[in-house]
């Protein structure tokens, strides 16, 4: 398993009470000495001051636990300041920037130099939604893009499977640790993604303790789907109020992950696109969110069955969104 001393330092610092992503981003660039980190922590934490010895003890404890827990299922972990830690796209506030990732597969697929297209949607697509989504994914892969999505059933799985069928690369972002792939029924797809040169990535090294925590993790996963892509594409999704708009859906709890991811993309100034054909989808509730986004944003790209090639080229030729740049000390990854 590959990791740097810097990654262990970031993980250890984050374990202190009151220390979150925003604090890490504001105070650490990566590769600081333990003396410096402890000094900064003691200016912030409200508990008893920590010490270099205590920090070192916590750090080695984390290291032994991670090796024991993930040696068989994780290729490594990277943190802010590491040479292979992926930079986010777009304008992301400090509290929402990732600082630490566990991975299995090729972490460089999230590189700022890579062209990444996120394709997402609902859990239960019907009719010709799958066929149309596959054609879009196929075209992007054909033009050299890497596909990014969650690992949920439905549109997420379709995007990964088509990327693999098209001999392309794909990245699955998880809400769970790598030793507990979720959903469990998609473990086979997860293994296939890695075997065929793709990537599994997660911010989590522990299992969730409650349904509320799991819900929060799905939201955090949705933000990563947005900030690690150059454009995000919505295949199909219900809107937040779909159950109220359609009598046959009254009382149903409809999935909202795609809605959240598209919202994060808007906030981060990541280009957005939707799959939508007015003549086919006008009365289909599974395209409620697509219609809503089209009404809200005049600049959104609309992909139909007839313009896939044209819109693919347009999306890939867009100027990149604002991307952060930083100079990292080239710490050595070690086994």
Name every feature range the model reports, one short phrase each.
Residues 1-82:
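Short, small/acidic-rich helices and loops at N termini and domain boundaries
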Residues 1-7, 80-335:
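Glycine-biased, small-residue-rich flexible motifs in mid-sequence functional cores and linkers
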């Amino acid at each position: 398993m590959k990791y740097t001393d810097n990654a262990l330092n970031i993980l250890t610092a984050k374990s202190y009470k009151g220390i979150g992503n925003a604090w890490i981003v504001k105070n650490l660039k990566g590769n600081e000495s333990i003396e410096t980190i402890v000094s900064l922590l003691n200016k912030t934490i409200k508990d008893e001051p920590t010490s270099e010895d205590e920090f070192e003890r916590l750090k080695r404890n984390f290291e032994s636990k991670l090796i024991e827990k993930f040696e068989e299922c994780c290729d490594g972990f990277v943190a802010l300041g590491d040479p292979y830690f992926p930079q986010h796209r777009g304008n992301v506030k400090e509290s929402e920037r990732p600082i630490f990732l566990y991975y299995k597969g090729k972490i460089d697929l999230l590189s700022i130099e890579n062209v990444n297209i996120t394709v997402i949607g609902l859990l239960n697509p019907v009719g010709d939604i799958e066929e149309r989504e596959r054609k879009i994914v196929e075209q992007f892969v054909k033009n050299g893009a890497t596909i990014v999505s969650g690992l949920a059933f439905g549109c997420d799985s379709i995007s990964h499977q088509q990327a693999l069928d098209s001999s392309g690369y794909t990245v699955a972002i998880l809400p769970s640790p790598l030793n507990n792939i979720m959903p469990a029924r998609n473990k086979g797809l997860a293994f296939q993604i890695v075997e065929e040169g793709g990537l599994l990535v997660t911010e989590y090294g522990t299992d969730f303790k409650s349904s509320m925590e799991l819900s929060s993790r799905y939201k955090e996963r949705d933000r990563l789907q947005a900030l690690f892509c150059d454009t995000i594409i919505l295949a199909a999704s219900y809107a937040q109020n779909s159950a109220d708009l359609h009598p046959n859906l009254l009382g149903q709890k409809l999935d909202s992950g795609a809605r959240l991811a598209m919202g994060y993309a808007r906030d981060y100034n990541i280009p957005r696109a939707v799959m939508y054909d007015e003549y086919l989808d006008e009365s289909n509730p599974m395209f409620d969110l697509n219609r809503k986004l089209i009404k809200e944003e005049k600049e959104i790209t609309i992909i139909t069955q007839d313009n896939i090639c044209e819109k693919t080229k347009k999306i890939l030729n867009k100027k990149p969104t604002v991307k952060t740049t930083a100079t990292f000390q080239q710490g050595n990854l070690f086994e």
